[in-house]
Each structure stands twice: as structure tokens, then as C-alpha cells.
Amino acid sequence: AHSYNPQAADMAYALDPFNMTWVDGGRYAILGPSGCGKTTMLNIMSGIVQPSEGKLLFDGVDVTTLSTSERNIAQVFQFPVIYGTMSVEQNLAFPLVCRNYEKSVIDAKVQEVAEALSLQGLLKKSASRLTADQKQLISLGRGLVRDDVAAVLMDEPLTVIDPDLKFRLRRQLKEINQKYRSTLIYVTHDQNEAMTFAENIIVMDAGKIVQVGSPAELFDRPKTTFVGYFIGAPAMNFFECQAAGGHKLSIGSAEIMAGTDLSKVGSAPLKLGIRSEYIRIVEAKGANTFTAQVQRVEDMGNYKLVTAVFEGHVIKVKVERDIAVPADRVELQLPAENCCVYAADILVS
């Protein structure tokens, strides 16, 4: 945990107390809105910030009070940090030169990293003359060139990168992770970056870790309504509802069978959540169906996005382009296995 003013009578946490284990060689993303504590967490790992409470362990060894240089951590910041008076080759070699590696070892390692990052043709160029994405690759390469780096921490590293290049760079990062088995921890507020890069995502809000899981877990079973809103485009559909006994609930006049036992939810306000990808357009009434009024149908390129209304509830439905959508009314079905029920905004398991 960390507070920037731990002596205050009304002390507020920038990072609430938590326990978490990071697996060596893993590929992680820390995802959340601005100011939620992402960078504070990253800076505690690297040693830039010392936590006001708790310990940081590497392989069981307490490193909480160690300096950044003693932790063998590489950190890539939002804006590229390079040595403009040096060539690309000299930039990549610099961490090894500082540790008095033999020249033959330095040359071999620089060539290996340059090949992994597609920088071979730029090694003799001045680093100051490169594009923003090339400079950021140099920053990353300086972290990878050392064999003793325990983890590479990246704080929104693609902010300055042209959108067309971001996908390619994320792919390169994944290839580097697979080749070197370096632990990569990537901070971002962009869900698309997190979902396409990470094996596991840590979702944060207001200094708290609200869910840790794979992209599929976060998408299919968000543990809070916040995660449901934050992950996905469009966000998860949510309907205020009431328990109707057993696994049944009611959304207005519609009766829905959910895959969750609701007998112990008590008096907490309930919401049903379901992704737009899982709602079906059907031809006839049946289990878990209701009739909604079509507001608009948008062609999104590789799919259609239907916006419909049922008794005041706005519903987003993704359908394949070749599916015909009625102009006025549509019968919608909510499959029970895809329904998530939330009591006081927390997933009922």
C-alpha cells in the first residue's frame, strides 16, 4: 500500500493494500483510468517510490528498501529516453559498457537485440534523428540487452507512437516476451492495448485492484459493473432487475432465467449484465426473450450494431453483417449461460 502523506490524520491511499504474485516470464497489463494508481504501482516495483506500508519480494527476497539500480529492473517511460549524441548501437550497448562487459559480448548482444527489434539497419545512425517509435524501441532494447534484468516495466510506452504502428509494436513486444521469457509489465488506460498484449490484466480503479484475469475472463465474467463498463466496445449491457425466485429474475415485464442462484442475494439492488456479442435476434418468442423497439442499425464494417429499447432499457446488440434486422421491432434472447448478475455492483458467483 502507499500514501503520499502517511502522517496525515485523514490519510488517503494512492494505492490501497493488496497482495499479488507476478510469475516470472509473464506478460501483464495494468489497466485503469487516469489517476487510479497504475504508475504508483509501477514505480514501487522499480524503486522510484518506496511503499508506505508492506513489502516487495523478488524470489522471496525482501527488496523493499533497495535502490533502483540494485533491483535489476528496466523501466520504459511514456516518452522515449535516449542519448541523442550517441548512435543507436551505442545507446543499446550503454548498459553493458557501464557494467564493463567484454566488447565481443557487447557486440553479440547488441546485434541480437537489434535483430529482435528490427533495428539492424539503423545501428550506425544518430539516435537523435530517429522517429518517435524507433526511439521507444531503443529504450526497450536497453532493457532487453542485459541478461540480468528481472522485469521490464513500461509506463504507457506507445503514447507517442503513431496509431498505425502500435499494433506492430505490440506484436514485437509479445515476440520478445516469448523469445527471452522476460517479465513484461505494461501500464495503459487503453483497453485495446491491454487486451491484445497481455496474458493477464490487472484492472484498477481509485487506488484499488478490482479484478485480475485473462482478457477472456475480464470480458466474459467481469467481477464488478465497473469492469463491465470499462472493458468492451460497446460496454456490457446492464439492466436493473429483481429476483423472482431461484435462478429467475425480472427485467420489467420480462422474466429471465439466469445461470446464477439468486436465493441469497438479500435486499441488495440487482443488475443483469450481458455482452452485446451474446444477445441473439430470434424469430419467435421463447425462453429468455422479449420484444424491443429498434432505434437504429449502424454498419460498423465487419458487423452491425443494433440499438434497441425495452421498457426504458437501452440495449446494444452486435450481429453479423448478413443478418437481416427488422426496421421496427425485434425479438431478443438473453442466453442464461452468458448472463452475469450483480448485487450492489459485485458479481454474484
Show the residue positions of the predicted features.
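Conserved ABC transporter NBD signature motif
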Residues: 54-62
